[in-house]
Amino acid sequence: MGAYKYMQELWRKKQSDVMRFLLRVRCWQYRQLSSLHRAPRPTRPDKARRLGYKAKQGYVIYRIRVRRGGRKRPVPKGATYGKPVHHGVNQIKFARSLQSVAEERAGRHCGGLRVLNSYWVGEDSTYKFFEVILIDTFHKAIRRNPDTQWITKAVHKHREMRGLTSAGKKSRGLGKGHKFHLTIGGSRRAAWKRRNTLQLHRYR
């Protein structure tokens, strides 16, 4: 096995004495830093490489701290108006994962960079910590490489805002196989609309 395989096995056993100590110390360290800061290198190089990171110019790592827990509906004095079924304020669950929220915040902060992917690095009772891989699309090392030219195209601007990253696609219900029939046609809304629209074809 190569070195990265050993690192992968270490991270799989998070309850081991070594990892429990490491994660605890790192969480303390991350709490002292600002909620969004640049990391000098990936904490998990094996995971970062699997997600597309390369230790070369043009690649940047940002570490994000996201507060855990559900979402409270932002309404003044709890006045939601409308029917009682929609009166909920406190026990609202956000549709997207905290990882996709972290990607969005990194993308907003670094508007000139493109979000490639992200991964979990730790959590405690209050926060979750993620590292986001960003790419500088104007760097020659990125533009001249056939493997990374795709992300330099304008259609990939703020892909994290539109649910095009791996974490963003999870909450959209996209995938292959019989478990993902609700999103045939691109989205849940498209699938629902097609099934609930009466189409009377001319020849039948």
From Swiss-Prot:
Gene Ontology biological process terms, A to Z: cytoplasmic translation
Gene3D superfamilies: Ribosomal protein l15e (3.40.1120.10)
Superkingdom of origin: Eukaryota
Any one annotated GO CC term: cytosolic large ribosomal subunit
Regions crossing the membrane: none
Subcellular location: Cytoplasm
Molecular function via GO: RNA binding; structural constituent of ribosome
Database matches in InterPro entries: Rbsml_eL15_core_dom_sf, Ribosomal_eL15, Ribosomal_eL15_CS, Ribosomal_uL23/eL15/eS24_sf
Keyword RNA-binding in annotation: no
Pfam family, one: Ribosomal_L15e
Record's keyword terms, sorted: Cytoplasm, Ribonucleoprotein, Ribosomal protein
The protein's assembly and partners: Component of the large ribosomal subunit.
Record family assignment: Belongs to the eukaryotic ribosomal protein eL15 family.
Stated role: Component of the large ribosomal subunit. The ribosome is a large ribonucleoprotein complex responsible for the synthesis of proteins in the cell.
Protein's recorded name: Large ribosomal subunit protein eL15
Species of provenance: Ctenopharyngodon idella (Grass carp)
Organism lineage string: Eukaryota, Metazoa, Chordata, Craniata, Vertebrata
Gene: rpl15
